Amino acid sequence: MSAQSGLSLYDSKRQQKLAFKPLVEGEVSLYVCGPTVQSAPHAGHLRSALVYDLMSKWFSALGYRVKLVRNITDIDDKILENAKAQSIDWQQLAREMSDEFKAGYDKLAIETPSAEPLATDHIASMQKLISLLIDKGHAYRANDGSANVYFATLSWPAYGELTNQKPEDMDSSDELLAGKVAANDFALWKASKPEEPETAAWDSPWGKGRPGWHIECSAMSTDLLGEHFDIHGGGLDLRFPHHENELAQSRAAGFEYANFWVHNGLVNSNGTKMSKSLGNFVSADNLFEQDPRGLAIRYYLLTAHYRANLEYHDGVLAEAKTNIRGIESFVKRALSLIAPALESPSAFLQNEFDFDLLPADFVAAMNDDLNVPAALAVLHEAIRAGNSAVDAAEINSVTEQLGATIMMCKALNVYPFDVNASGEAVWPTAEASAELKSKIEQLVADRLAAKAAKDFARADAIRDELTNLGVTLEDSADKTNWSVN
């Protein structure tokens, strides 16, 4: 059985794990609801992007050609509200926040998707889709004479199929707008308001306004992937009402739409969903202050199954750094032992990804609905066995376990090593290295100043912080040398 044929994914709509078979042999089409760029990213945003980046990478490792589309919602009530509160142009806010999201993705080695459409670039497609729904009797202009247009949920008997709800039992969380026929009807087109900027309104057959949130994703996904594609992904909090409404309007328009619906769990703080509205979130900037390298953040975000919620507390990155150091330690020990038998130790570290070197248990875990925690267990078992082999100087076993470890780390993109021209281990990216070096040098200088001022408690605290960054200090009479473990 090929590795491809062994892959299964959990479909949220059918509520079961199913064998994955793409619509087009050898190709995978994947649409993911990206961020609404109203403010800077937090841990939950990073996790969602990481999940689908890893999913895309695993499909590629299996030999598929992947088209990943992750949208950016750059027009929204909250964007307008936040821009007004900050006295800046809403388009400027959207651009600046989009840049912050991209910076966070880059630091976590999350690749740029095949396409990253802006909602505002697809207004014409949204209007065309709304007109189609009106023509089919599934949408109507508001009965109060405004430019609002609503999806008629009563016209679509399957409404509620994604979340297995009956319309009468739904807690409609769509905003209460005038002119609706039924409580669950949701906005496809929203009339502009006098207090909103003119640039946030577009001409339409129904009057000036802007698209509703749900219609945006239906238009962008079908524009870029067609009316029938393999997978639709997004956060668990988007299942209702966003994805429920998105599915209803797409199917009512006559589209087959997504074969699989995949939802990632949330990042919680003290058992509660991390969100900006609750003020209980940890920002991406805060995470990168704790881990400029970004590798421990990535490792931490992978420690729970993607469908499960992930708990955040102050010690999670320290735990992740310990695991990363365990990988580093084994690779260094193993390479030191086998280096004499290698033509080029640095070339060994730089070997291209080789799927055939992945242990069968690792492949089975990843093919089982992307079970990364089980895959990490296989990785750490290989490290344990490899360390034992190093202790026993079993060259062949060490070489085998080292090769497997490197390939597993590369598959998960938690590989802690690159090499310089001398074959010495260095940080994965020059950008991360420069940022980390700057932070370390500042902390070392602060510690020297604290010692000079006889503030030894402060000096010890800085030493602890440097230790958590994987830094070893060597004090001399007039200076401090440092190295990274």
Where are these regions (language model features)?
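Short, well-structured beta-strand/strand-turn elements
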Residues: R65-K67, G137-D144, T472-E474
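Alpha-helical recognition segments enriched in aromatics with Gly/Pro capping
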Residues: M1-Q38, D53, A124-L337
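N-terminal, positively charged nucleic-acid-binding surface of large information/translation enzymes
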Residues: R14-A19, L23-E111, L129, W482
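Structural preference for alpha-helix termini/caps and helix-kink/transition segments
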Residues: F281-N485
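Short catalytic-loop micro-motif centered on adjacent basic/acidic residues
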Residues: L68-V69, P113-P117, H232-G234, T399
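Short, glycine/charge-rich beta-strand/loop segments that flank catalytic centers
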Residues: I72-D77, M97-F101, E111-M126, N143-S155
